[in-house]
Amino acid sequence: MRNLSNAELAKILDKDIFHLISQAADSLGLECYVVGGYVRDLFLERPSNDIDVVVVGSGIQVASALKQKLGRKAHLSVFRNFGTAQVKYRDIEVEFVGARKESYNHDSRKPIVEDGTLEDDQNRRDFTINALAVCLNSKRFGELVDPFDGVYDLEDGIVATPLDPDITFSDDPLRMMRCVRFATQLNFQIEDETYEALSRNADRLKIISGERIADEMNKIMLSPHPSCGFYYLKDTGLLQLIMPELCELDKVETRCGRSHKNNYDHTMEVLENVCCQTSNLWLRWAALLHDIGKPRSKRWDNQAGWTFRNHNVVGARMIPSMFRRMKLPMDAKMKYVQKLVELHMRPIVISDEEVTDSAVRRLLNDAGDDIDDLMTLCEADITSKNQVRKQHFLDNFRLVREKIADLKVRDYKRLFQPCIDGREIMEMFHLGSCPEVGALKQTLKDAVLDGKVANEREPLMELLMQKAKEHGLIE
């Protein structure tokens, strides 16, 4: 977080694009402000190329005037039904909208829009940190307008609504997901009144499309520490509406003095462990869902206590219906998550026993190109507080990885290194080390790699004799 004076803001905005916007607005006699995320990110020192501009008047007029100043290389898109316009120039995108005030019907998040002032426009913003505005008109260039002390909230690391949070969330329930997302992405706390309003209005999320919710879920998942967001979602009741199956993991049962671990907390640990290793969105989803089958497979055994046999298989079968309901992709991404969930116990079983070639080869066959991601998930799944037991598994996983690498090399040689080698060619044609031997050896290798000849002795020998004849080694 960086505290910026108006003079410092003016210096940061001392770029051609902002001066051209300023000139365009001044020529039309209209107030013009850069607003929202771009301003927020200036204070947070985060890069941003997407610029939102509010005009007190017609945003389309200012956008058109800017296009004229930028010339042919700029592209103008006008959306008259929404009163907005977009100008694209090189790697910069500027969105223009007229200042407006909004009101909502209870059963819709589509607002009733009227022309308004800058104050009206800032009142309708979702959070104080997104309600910041900086004037671009030449006489006030760089002047910050911050009626809700959003800069202080940025400094304190707080997400809060500008006005009554119950009205903010009831009017547009997607803002509840955005609230959790911003808190997670920025590692901020949610202000107390705002947090309580999330719980009170959670049921309003039902009017939001699955696609919009899925988009916010993916943004939370790609945050540095997504578990923070999932605890917010669970504790406010939002997660119960989105993924009730995940909430089931939070239940701990005790019988005969024996309890099982809290599988929700364990899942959050696994998710964080995976996030430390990769930004792969779908591997993160696999981490989130790897134990999703445990509640449905939980059984009590008088000897063993609580068991979750085949929870990986049960969980894998749940994935398609969950993805379909949440409007997540029903394609190779879903199958990837399903595969990792189903296979995530296999390396653990292998590592707990003798690490044999056959067991690892079967694992390689089933996991295919996703073997490294599977191993990352399995290593993340070791969350035992018993450090000796944890180290035992991690050491064995290292052996499994070494065996996988060794088998890949050996199997490659077995599959693609011709079964007739250079030494045999030399003996067959009574040759020493010479270019002809190298040429014949390369011919056989190319034929195998190109799939023209099976890596079997008889077809390779036939090809060898044909090429030897061409080289004059036999008649």
Where is each model-derived feature located?
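Catalytic cores of the polymerase beta-like nucleotidyltransferase superfamily
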Residues: 1-475
